[in-house]
Amino acid sequence: MESTTKVKVNGFVESTSSSAAPAIQTKSTTGFDAELQDGLSCKELFQNGEGLTYNDFLILPGYIDFTAEEVDLSSPLTKSLTLRAPLVSSPMDTVTESEMAIAMALCGGIGIIHHNCTPEYQALEVHKVKKYKHGFMRDPSVMSPTNTVGDVLEARRKNGFTGYPVTENGKLGGKLLGMVTSRDIDFRENQPEVLLADIMTTELVTAPNGINLPTANAILEKSKKGKLPIVNQAGELVAMIARTDLKKARSYPNASKDSNKQLLVGAAIGTRSEDKARLALLVANGVDVIILDSSQGNSVYQVEMIKYIKETYPELQVIGGNVVTRAQAKNLIDAGVDGLRVGMGSGSICITQEVMACGCPQATAVYQVSTYARQFGVPVIADGGIQSIGHIVKAIALGASAVMMGSLLAGTSEAPGEYFFSDGVRLKKYRGMGSLEAMERGDAKGAAMSRYYHNEMDKMKVAQGVSGSIVDKGSVLRYLPYLECGLQHSCQDIGANSINKLRDMIYNGQLRFMKRTHSAQLEGNVHGLFSYEKRLF
């Protein structure tokens, strides 16, 4: 009788048989056979307490029985918010303002507006995002019959469009009398005093209150009008739909939207008492999620701010951080956070680990915190150290629900700032929020300083970040689809047909890992060539 022993060597299972007859192997239809497990489980990968980064390991391939296009990238951002793609832009003043946040949301992610600016400026940026893709516009700009052509021209300069409903009292809820459009004021630029009552269009196509969005869109499409007013039985204006929004919905079907079909947007605030006024402005402008922006989030200041937000705005989603240990995470979870931001000193422009001797290698931090937070249903955002699609996949494979990107998005046309040339290369500025340049920004009123527990009166500030430049990457609207496509193909290689399935594979032991030596890392990169061009998309 044949006897077989199984020996695990360097993470591989090797079978030895006392008989020379070849062993008959059966193929698993799922690709998962406990007796043929190679590599290490996630728990085994970190069991020695080593500080690992994303480049220190690989994920072993799995079984493919689906196409890459079938991979579902939906993933929770917080307890109540789900993204169509697990991608978040960092709240940095050289990464995310309204233009970046709009692009992120259109592609299924979300942008977090930075707070290194005045509260009014930040609230306006949030407002721009919420107004970009309206769906049902519940608070459209409205004119009255006594408004003039000059008022419409001024509104066009401010808002960027010319079509406005006209009601009896010039307010939403007033009886709808007509519409004024660009065709009504054409050639009247020199007649700013003309009343809208004399030029507005009164024959309108409307839809009844309570109509669903697909039906309303069908009416709008058939009418060939630019806007569709929604009225109640008394003929009073209650909402609007715009044709431009219908076009946007077709171009970006996976956009991240709220219940009103408006784009999702987040904003960062500090933990100082004056940030409560900033928070009120952001909430008034429709912000969907708040990130408490701190390099070390395990503080009495953040705990108190979390409790204040939950008491004052119980429905508002709050993400706490940054944290890198389970003990840090516990205090914020106990305070009531809806999500956690993980990372300390791992960003490309961050020097916290070097200067403060404090932090944690990012892969280890993501695994430890996400494993703990999972028990309480709190999603984790991996923040820092993301340099490629592979790093995004690895962060999620360690338990993160989403990744936050800074340098990966800096240099795109949607990032704040102007391009400049150096030695013929088109560049854009990128700086850490802990850099002296960011902390000394004139209009910020100390917002970036508060992230590192400095204030404007400090005589000496210790920099925890640097300033640099990034090569032009083009538009985020081209770059994000590349990242998402790569993420789908990577999940296919691993054998996970969704982001949620990938995370499940961590905890049932189906996902297998392999540590990489320095030589293995060199082997896995381009080598042996005299010269090469690395084009990613």
UniProtKB/Swiss-Prot annotation:
**One biological-process term from Gene Ontology?**
purine nucleotide biosynthetic process
Q: Which CDD domains match?
A: CBS_pair_IMPDH, IMPDH
- The answer to whether the entry has keyword Metal-binding is yes
Cited Gene3D superfamilies: Aldolase class I
**GO cellular component term, pick one:** cytoplasm
Region forming the signal peptide: none
Q: Which UniProt keywords apply?
A: CBS domain, Cytoplasm, GMP biosynthesis, Metal-binding, NAD, Oxidoreductase, Phosphoprotein, Potassium, Purine biosynthesis, Repeat
Q: Give binding positions for K(+).
A: 345, 347, 350, 523-524
Tissue specificity annotation: Enriched in adult ovary and testis.
Q: What is its EC number?
A: 1.1.1.205
A Pfam cross-reference name: IMPDH
The pathway noted for it is: Purine metabolism; XMP biosynthesis via de novo pathway; XMP from IMP: step 1/1
Sites binding IMP sit at 348, 383-385, 406-407, 430-434, 464
- The positions flagged as active site in the entry are 350
Where is the protein localized?
Cytoplasm
Protein activity control: Mycophenolic acid (MPA) is a non-competitive inhibitor that prevents formation of the closed enzyme conformation by binding to the same site as the amobile flap. In contrast, mizoribine monophosphate (MZP) is a competitive inhibitor that induces the closed conformation. MPA is a potent inhibitor of mammalian IMPDHs but a poor inhibitor of the bacterial enzymes. MZP is a more potent inhibitor of bacterial IMPDH.
What cofactors does this protein use?
K(+)
- The family this protein is said to belong to: Belongs to the IMPDH/GMPR family.
**Function as written in the Swiss-Prot or TrEMBL entry:** Catalyzes the conversion of inosine 5'-phosphate (IMP) to xanthosine 5'-phosphate (XMP), the first committed and rate-limiting step in the de novo synthesis of guanine nucleotides, and therefore plays an important role in the regulation of cell growth.
The record, for NCBIfam families, names: IMP_dehydrog
**Protein name, entry field:** Inosine-5'-monophosphate dehydrogenase
Record lineage: Eukaryota, Metazoa, Ecdysozoa, Arthropoda, Hexapoda
- Encoding gene per record: ras
